[in-house]
């Protein structure tokens, strides 16, 4: 996705990963 941050929380239809 757009945000290549950290853990395995995938949000949105873009498959963005956010810090858990």
UniProtKB/Swiss-Prot annotation:
Keyword Lyase part of the UniProt annotation: no
UniProt family annotation: Belongs to the jacalin lectin family.
Known partners and oligomeric status: Formed of four alpha chains and four beta chains.
Organism lineage string: Eukaryota, Viridiplantae, Streptophyta, Embryophyta, Tracheophyta
Function: D-galactose-specific lectin, binds the T-antigen structure Gal-beta1,3-GalNAc.
Keyword Membrane on entry: no
Region (Disordered): 1-20
Keyword tags: Lectin
GO MF terms, alphabetically ordered: carbohydrate binding
Taxonomic superkingdom: Eukaryota
Name of this protein: Agglutinin beta-2 chain
